[in-house]
Each structure stands twice: as structure tokens, then as C-alpha cells.
Amino acid sequence: MATNLKSTAKLVKPIQYDEVIEVERIFADPAFIEQHRQRILASFKDAKESALYHELTHIVIKDNLFSCAMNAIVGYFEFNIDEAELKNVMEGLKRDVIQGAEDNTVQAIAEKIIKKALVFNHLQKEWKVEITDEVVKNVISLYYEKTNQSVREYLDDKQKFEGVRTALLEERMVLETINHFKFHFNLTGQLPN
């Protein structure tokens, strides 16, 4: 997670972790699902369709719960978004992720990315979440055992090793965020036109 951000976040009131968050719809972006499907298949070539379906369903639900939690959490903060940082994130999105989208859409996504990083930095300190070298090594070893693919590059290259740590930290923070709240599913709303 980004720790050297120019943007800032200030907690303006204590986060109410006993808040019940309403989930009124489940959003599943086909491109998001396909991206995860390909990632799973690249790691586990012999994955059965039922296991793949189960894992993708789990990912979609987790992503939706996390989004609902983050929507609630950002209301407890006041943000000061650095214009140069925002522009840099927007350019990266336009180049690597979103082609042809309107600037206001890209800006909204870029602001969410920056706010998420700021909130994660705050919550990581509050919850004292860390990923040790030993945990990173264990995950890399487990990956080797399951896939039989070479992992030496991740153990020998500090940048790749830290990339694994960052991915694990982000996943842990997503799960911690979800686990700090209660959710109520109210999926009886209207279908979008």
C-alpha cells in the first residue's frame, strides 16, 4: 500500500464498527470476473469448473462487502486530495486500465483509489496489521507446493518479494475491513433498466 502519498486524510469522528451496513445489490463486472478467472487458471491449470465457480463467487461477494464497508468508512474522514497525485493516478488509469472513459469518470475512480490508500494506511496503524518476512516466505513456498512453478525470483528479487508483501497486506486489510462490520443483505430492490 502506498505510504508516501501527498494527499491526506483526517479522521473527523470515531469509526462506528458496530454499524450494520446495508447491501442492496451485488455488482459483478464481467471484465473483473474474467480477470480473476484467468489469474486462477494461470496458477491452477487443473482447477475444476465447480471450484472455479466457487472461488469467483467468493471473490465477487468479498469485493461487494468491501466496497460497501469502504463507502461507509470514508464518511468518517476528511480528505485533501493532492492535484498532482490525482492527475498522476488518472493518467495511469487511462493508460493501463480504462480506455475511452470520460474524464469525470476516471477522476472519480482515481479519487477512490487515493482515498482507499489513505484509509488503509490509517486502519493498518489502528489495527496494527503487518506482514512479516516469514509470512511472505511461507506464502511463496505454499504457492510453489501447489503449482510447482519456480518461485526463486520472488525470494531473490527484493522488489518482487515486497510486491508479494503488498498484495498480502492489501488482502489482509480487505478481510479485516469486512470483519470489522456487520452486513445486512437487502436485495429486494429494483433491477436497473
UniProtKB/Swiss-Prot annotation:
Annotated GO biological process: protein folding; protein transport
Protein name: Uncharacterized protein MG377 homolog
